[in-house]
Amino acid sequence: AEDKLDADKAKELVDHQVCVITMAPIVNEDVAKAGVKSLTKDQLISIFTGKTTNWKEVGGPDEDIVLVTRPGSSGTRATFQKYALDGNEEASNASMETDDSGVLLTNVKDTKGAIGYVALSYLTGDAGVETVAIDGVEPTLENTYSGEYPVWTFEHMYTKGEPNEVVSAFLDYITGDKYGSQMEKLGYGVSSKMTKTEH
């Protein structure tokens, strides 16, 4: 909250971690069918920074890599850049940049050779794209919970000061098991199932 408010106002807020968002690299189905099912973190960094420009360089088809990314203001991009790319800047000048994760997914689906990233919540049905493992670890909630998969963050709710009884009851409901099972069906992780609470 401190990057959005001045420090004095931010100090009044109490942070409540309410769920987990896992981000997954996704590729056009033709790339996956040609054998790209997993990339090392170094390969992922090389692709998203524009150094690797053809899929054959990472065991895929002889096809140009098309980057589909989010803008610099995106929280999805910030999380992916920090944990999947080790903080390396994406080659935005060489990518199709979109403000919306749903549009990004459609662009990856419809563009030969495309790669991008979305939250698992966008992949609950038949999305028409394939996820890519990082260093052999699939982007799943189970692998996020165990701490094996590295690209995740918490979603937050904030209260001004400690929550009152009604707000506490709502937060308990949001973070409880019954609501948690619904969140998992929608691709969101349950905070209490995390074995790691920090990266």
Task: Label the model's feature ranges.
Residues A1-H199:
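Exported/periplasmic ABC-transporter solute-binding proteins
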